[in-house]
Amino acid sequence: MLATIDPIALRLGPISIHWYAICIVSGLLLAVYLAQRLAPEKGINPEHILDFILLAFPIAIVGARLYYVIFQWSYYSQNPSEIFAIWNGGIAIYGGLIAGAAVLYWFAKRHAIAVLDFLDIAAPGVMIAQSIGRWGNFVNQEAYGKAVSQLNYLPEIIRQQMFIDGSYRVPTFLYESLWNLVGFSIILGLRYFNKGLRQGDVTSFYLIWYGLGRFVIEGMRTDSLMFAGLRVSQWVSISIIILGAVLLYFRKQRQKADYKMKN
């Protein structure tokens, strides 16, 4: 039987580099690379991508941590020194997305970039970054599901890491990582095979796909705050699914109106 993975990947004297940080930064770098490759298709200067990331990334991390702390306040109110211990894990993707989206809107307006164009080139990278980032939860043994009797369908390294507090746990991190990976692959397929994608289509797909996955997977977790019979993240998931569907509908209606005007 394998030992659990040390959350610290590397120690350099007093400095500890955590796997959690490596996963986040790796996902970020890949997201930046993809966005810069896609930017010229929308007439966006690739240098704007790096400028945006340097501004948005720290704000998104703060937003993700703030969201997590707010919904775990019963713990952090008793352990205030832990609020800033982000290296121990505990950031909420939705908090980061909300903060990042706010910065993106401001940045796009400031640089006269169409918001939907910016979102369309960002969405593929964000999805693959989320897929990679979930493995940080795996190493930290967090964001898992209910106790189960066995996980024999999984490799031993995952089974052992999901053996927490005397029980095997549903590896919700893995389900979400794979869901996002599939979503990323679909986006690439749509871009390659469907040259008629409209502005906002990729963003709509991202919102609907990610929201559906999170809604289902959050229902398997045991560490999320409940509200009105659902987990808070499930309510947020419903909201972004609706947002994606509404965006898709109105873009379709606009396309029909434009077609009628031309004909």
Swiss-Prot record:
Entry GO MF terms: phosphatidylglycerol-prolipoprotein diacylglyceryl transferase activity
Show the disulfide pairing: none
Membrane-crossing residues?
15-35, 52-72, 83-103, 112-132, 170-190, 200-220, 230-250
- Identify the PROSITE patterns for this entry: LGT
Concerning Pfam families, the annotation shows: LGT (PF01790)
Q: Which residues are a 1,2-diacyl-sn-glycero-3-phospho-(1'-sn-glycerol)-binding?
A: 134
Q: How does it sit in the membrane?
A: Multi-pass membrane protein
Any keyword Metal-binding?
no
| Compartment annotation | Cell membrane
Which EC numbers does the record give? Answer: 2.5.1.145
Q: Name one GO biological process term.
A: lipoprotein biosynthetic process
Q: Can you cite an annotated GO cellular component?
A: plasma membrane
Q: Which UniProt keywords apply?
A: Cell membrane, Membrane, Transferase, Transmembrane, Transmembrane helix
Carries keyword Metal-binding? Answer: no
Per the record, the pathway is:
Protein modification; lipoprotein biosynthesis (diacylglyceryl transfer)
Location, primary (coarse class): membrane
Give the protein family: Belongs to the Lgt family.
Could you tell me which HAMAP family the record lists for this protein?
Lgt
Summarizing the function annotation, the protein's role is:
Catalyzes the transfer of the diacylglyceryl group from phosphatidylglycerol to the sulfhydryl group of the N-terminal cysteine of a prolipoprotein, the first step in the formation of mature lipoproteins.
Supply the name of the protein.
Answer: Phosphatidylglycerol--prolipoprotein diacylglyceryl transferase
Q: Which gene encodes it?
A: lgt
